[in-house]
């Protein structure tokens, strides 16, 4: 090799583009390493070269510098790259761990400065690392994938995308081993396809579509965690035939994609990890955005924005990057309170700039959706206010100086509510209403009046706002406006624009692709009723009505000085004017007037009886509307507060708790059920639709009424029991797409938020009367474990033990346990307590053992460990245990080690036979146990590899080689000896080196051809001549001694461990608590 200074200087310009910027430490590190390498190896022959490097890499410092130098040569000299890579693999001491870590850092920080040759060679090196199964390459692949920027169709970016596509297509099997990487690749390429609609990209787009569709369909279980952001991306490519068919399957045949997939709404309810959003920005752009949001003062941002505009938005195609930036800013950048109080530029100002500077109608429509996307599915119990804050602040601060921005955003918000997903319009409406309620509750803005009642809004938009957000708008006059039929303009779907096959062509399409014609035809028309809210969801302070009216209201505002203690439904009524009176038949009008005056049960019952006896032609539509609105108004005013649920369940207390007008209507339904008059049923439907708490109050009434009737007749059964059919009749009458099961889940969810004690009181009856819905219901079970304390848990377990309550059975336990892995720690502890209370055998859910991760699922692992202590080792249990991945190179899997050591105290010989048979089955050649291998496909899917088996045995050996030798008797059994010998014979050189101490435990067999072959290796099987062999001899002697001891002594000895044991060091600092259902700001 040439060691001259000229040769070294020749390489200096080949890795990084030369700029006027001073080299940083990262660049200098590679330069120094290469120069030192050249000086050391100049003029050496190949033999001397390898001998010298082999001696140098034994030292940590030299090993790192030589590795960097070889990487430098690979990235700068394509002709010598294959030979240099071979040298690198021969000289590495850590399985190329140092190399992959430094390459990942290089890509993240310096990729934009790499030369074209360096970028090309980086892809070549990534391909070689994947081909040779090097560990931890996934992080490097993820960093390179981030560099494939959206909105960039430059030759360099397209070459990178094509290179990555080639690698992932060629090494598909490697890709599918990593669930997160599968999701990232699918998410990335669906986003990139959006930019490749130009005619010059036809071939590339076809390859991308073929690859990503295949990946999505084959690995849809890994796609589900991508959540709602993936749906947003899919809408932009929905016109491609392959994606159109995927949409049809997701909408109409979801089970064909994945047995556990229930449809698009399941994805929309799943929050997308911010890591996927972060992956769609290059590290360079991410650093610039972080600088803009944390260092630039408000008012000084223009020059930074101009620079950013010129650098990243300088082509028509680059405009699509705006949506990625908006989603990242909303979901990933959550400023602290100190920053919010400072003069740093706020997020809403940056988003406002991204919207106003957009020049492409397609991108602008998608950017609006990106801004409001979290609003559509907002759940105050789970979602973060920081995700909806920018949207309201952009409109609020723009209404004065930039009214056009606020008007277009308000118009978009009104239309997207009805047209985003017509089938679930009510859920979208609830999400947006929840967002506004949370905004007012957290006082993000004082109130909505300056925005919704601004004089700068045109008349049509104001009318649309009052119709869509009636609960938040101040009425224009004192007369209550009955919701009429939908206006033609309101029913016209807001059209989204998508790039057509020609790139610049704009194609109108309903947003998102959920608006497939067949899907829209199946959807129902928008309801004009008020949205559903529980009274305790929103406690924002509202201003008393100040509008002067000619009609007196039913409740006087001056009688209430402080409305904080009133239910929200009553507070709303303080702001609403009286209902315009309509003439009714005399008898019916008299009962209605009396009910409006008295607002009592005794006046409501005659009204219902009179209404039921009215003829078909007795009332017209206007009269029906007036009657319905009047009754609902009183029902809302007389809703019981939280205290109506009595602490003492005496007959008097229970009777008093259902002495409200709403329960009078339920009493009539209870008596008549299917024979209930049509007009009365229509009124009940309107009440349940407009009063969100009415659903669970029916459940409460059914329990109380049945209980009271049963006590009076001295029986708890028969016709006086909890009549579940009444609830079903009312659910069937609702003009809703929700099934009875979904109605139950919604009502129980509201009930749990409203009154936990009532929820727990009703729940046993729900499990008994709605067994088909409630049994194995993970949604309700999550509500249950999320609201109970230790006393409640004890009561539930008592009921289960007495046979009064069954929450789940063996058929649904696996799905329940899998979903519980995301619960909080106490919730998981409750789940496992309930599993034991139900006496569910371990064999029904043992299949989840390989899926559990030591660092993420400690609760489940400890519970299963305690259950395994009561089990005897079986072939299936041992197979599942040893199929677990070893997460730590040094510590191994403490769960597996603990189970094996415990079993060794009593079942050492049996355990040895099982493990030996499993290990032998991995090597079919000359295997005496070949016929014993399991044949079931389910077992083959989780069968451990030989590498996993040897890893677990090695860590087990380390854990028990000290002390009194407890557990080492596992290795002295004849079957295990033969298995280790056979494993040694079929192992590669690297495996023999890695597990040398383990193989050393196998005794010599003079007649065995296996040992003969081993004798020819460089290791030899002679008397121990080094420390390792001496340790092996001692371990074998200790094993023999331990095998002769009784189990009690073995148990005592099992507590002794050495410092380098694979068991956990309990004195070290505890790991941070695992985060589960946390908000994004955390």
UniProtKB/Swiss-Prot annotation:
Q: Where is this region: Disordered?
A: 483-563, 923-945, 1005-1082
Job of this protein: Component of the integrator complex, a multiprotein complex that terminates RNA polymerase II (Pol II) transcription in the promoter-proximal region of genes. The integrator complex provides a quality checkpoint during transcription elongation by driving premature transcription termination of transcripts that are unfavorably configured for transcriptional elongation: the complex terminates transcription by (1) catalyzing dephosphorylation of the C-terminal domain (CTD) of Pol II subunit Polr2A/Rbp1 and Spt5, and (2) degrading the exiting nascent RNA transcript via endonuclease activity.
Residue ranges annotated as compositionally biased, kind Polar residues, are: 936-945
InterPro entries registered for this protein in UniProt: HEAT_Ints3_C, INTS3, INTS3_N
- Biased amino acid composition, Low complexity: 517-528, 542-555, 1008-1018, 1033-1056
Q: Name one GO cellular component term.
A: cytoplasm
* This protein's name: Integrator complex subunit 3 homolog
Note the PANTHER family from the entry: INTEGRATOR COMPLEX SUBUNIT 3
